[in-house]
A protein has these predicted regions:
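A residue-level detector for a conserved hydrophobic packing site
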Residues: 54-58
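Conserved micro-motifs of the catalytic ATP-binding
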Residues: 3-8, 46-49
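Conserved polar catalytic motif of the HATPase_c/GHKL fold
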Residues: 59-60, 64
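Conserved catalytic submotifs in the C-terminal HATPase_c
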Residues: 9-11, 36-45
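Short conserved segment of the HATPase_c
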Residues: 94-107
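Short beta-strand/loop element within the Bergerat-fold HATPase_c
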Residues: 72-82
């Protein structure tokens, strides 16, 4: 993801619909992994963005839950007067040691019991969020990892 290499193609996107499609694609994998996903979704939430990047962003987020999550995850898509917020929280397999480095390129804490990680997942997510003009926040709350994307309307 070289600087300026991806130029977004902006159009009117139903964020809720694209998110729902991605959830259907990941449903079986999440179920097989024993991860119960709770979803809170504002319907017909439209936003001027790149539909392909939005889709790839969601795929990376859900893939991250599959690799590093366990038992429970919650996905929220909501808006207020000024912003649209996507929040994905999941219980982690291993405690997170260096939250501030998680989105660094090639950094991995090997938080997964089963899989080697390239350390690119959150780095890619951060880059997509920046390309789309949004803000990415990462946090931990007890056993939970919380990823929040804020897009300005």
């Amino acid at each position: 993801l070289m600087e300026g290499a991806i130029q977004p193609r902006i159009s009117d996107v139903d964020l809720s619909q694209v998110l729902t499609q991605q959830l259907f694609q990941y449903y079986d994998s999440l179920s097989e992994a024993g991860i119960a996903l709770e979803v809170e979704l504002e319907e017909h939430l439209h936003y001027a963005t790149d539909p392909e990047l939005w889709e790839r962003l969601l795929q990376n987020m859900l893939s991250n839950v599959l690799k590093h999550g366990k038992e429970q995850a919650r996905l929220t898509l909501m808006s207020d007067a000024d912003t649209i917020r996507v929040e994905l929280r999941n219980i982690v397999q291993q405690p997170i040691q260096h939250l501030d480095q998680l989105a660094s390129r090639f950094y991995s804490e090997n938080l997964s019991d089963t899989e080697e990680s390239s350390g690119l997942g959150l780095y890619i997510i951060q880059n997509f969020v920046e390309i789309l003009g949004g803000d990415l926040q990462l946090a931990t709350e007890a056993d939970w990892f919380v990823l929040t994307i804020t897009l300005k309307k």
